[in-house]
């Protein structure tokens, strides 16, 4: 099953989806080194996605994940140690989100080659 998204609704994806794959790979190595976002465990990915859905709001994210606020902070700090990015800080969150979109784009391109 494929999802069709109108071009006007892609947002920043319109820029990402025009990047050449070698440039995407270079960006990913700069941001993550060898630890790509698709190598994170399910709990970490769920935490990251929910945190972004809640606009970087720690309290709301912990409530929706049914975890204590300190547990969420611990997970975010663990992510920071492994990636060097503190997604509670807007600039790092933006870099991380773009990197996740680049990973999705690269996977899509691999499947369609």
Please name every model-derived segment.
Residues 1-113:
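Cytosolic nucleotide-utilizing catalytic cores of signal-transduction proteins
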């Amino acid at each position: 099953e494929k999802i069709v998204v109108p071009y006007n609704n892609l947002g920043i994806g319109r820029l990402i989806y025009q990047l050449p794959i070698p440039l995407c790979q270079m960006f990913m190595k700069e941001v993550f080194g060898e630890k790509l976002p698709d190598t994170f465990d399910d709990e970490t990915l769920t935490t990251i996605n929910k945190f972004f859905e809640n606009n970087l709001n720690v309290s709301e994210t912990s409530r929706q994940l049914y975890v204590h606020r300190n547990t969420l902070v611990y997970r975010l700090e663990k992510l920071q140690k492994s990636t060097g990015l503190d997604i509670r800080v807007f600039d790092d969150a933006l870099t991380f989100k773009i990197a996740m979109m680049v990973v999705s784009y690269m996977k899509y391109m691999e499947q369609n080659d």
